[in-house]
Amino acid sequence: MQASAAFPKAARLLKTDEFSSVFRLRPWRRTAHFVIYGKPTGRDARLGLVIGKKYAARAVTRNLVKRLAREAFRTRRAEFAGWDILLRLHARFDKKAMPSAASAPLAALCAGEIRELLDRAAREVARRNGAKPASE
């Protein structure tokens, strides 16, 4: 599948039962702020995001995280064909280290962690599919 510039509704987890079926599984990997889960489906790759107010109180921050995650997934969607991927924020960001709710350091931190998790998830998907990851 060729990665396109669009991120259609079909590429997202939307319903509660879709999220629940992925959440029931053990998390694959963690970073300081995020956890990633995956579930084989045999269909096109889909992304679910759980960015709660408990860990990102300001809407600006939640929207920034979601935008970065969607873009990172959209550009690598072909690597996750046949899988539902769920990304969850599980820790607060240090307010003292981040000058504002949508600062460049916060965006860089989130983008780096999301990229790292997607790299690990792509390797896990490739391992479970019995193929070599595209990055090797």
UniProtKB/Swiss-Prot annotation:
Gene3D superfamilies to which the protein is assigned, alphabetical: 3.30.230.10
EC number: 3.1.26.5
GO BP: tRNA 5'-leader removal
Catalysed reactions listed for this entry: Endonucleolytic cleavage of RNA, removing 5'-extranucleotides from tRNA precursor
One of the Pfam families matching this protein, by short name: Ribonuclease_P
CC annotations in GO: ribonuclease P complex
UniProt-recorded Gene Ontology molecular function terms: 3'-tRNA processing endoribonuclease activity; ribonuclease P activity; tRNA binding
Record flagged with keyword Ion transport: no
Keywords: Endonuclease, Hydrolase, Nuclease, RNA-binding, tRNA processing
Catalytic class of the enzyme: hydrolase
UniProt-listed InterPro entries: Ribosomal_Su5_D2-typ_SF (IPR020568), Ribsml_uS5_D2-typ_fold_subgr (IPR014721), RNase_P (IPR000100), RNase_P_CS (IPR020539)
Family of the protein in this entry: Belongs to the RnpA family.
HAMAP family, per database record: RNase_P
PANTHER family: RIBONUCLEASE P PROTEIN COMPONENT
Quaternary state and interactors: Consists of a catalytic RNA component (M1 or rnpB) and a protein subunit.
Role: RNaseP catalyzes the removal of the 5'-leader sequence from pre-tRNA to produce the mature 5'-terminus. It can also cleave other RNA substrates such as 4.5S RNA. The protein component plays an auxiliary but essential role in vivo by binding to the 5'-leader sequence and broadening the substrate specificity of the ribozyme.
NCBIfam families found in the cross-reference section: rnpA (TIGR00188)
Name assigned to this protein: Ribonuclease P protein component
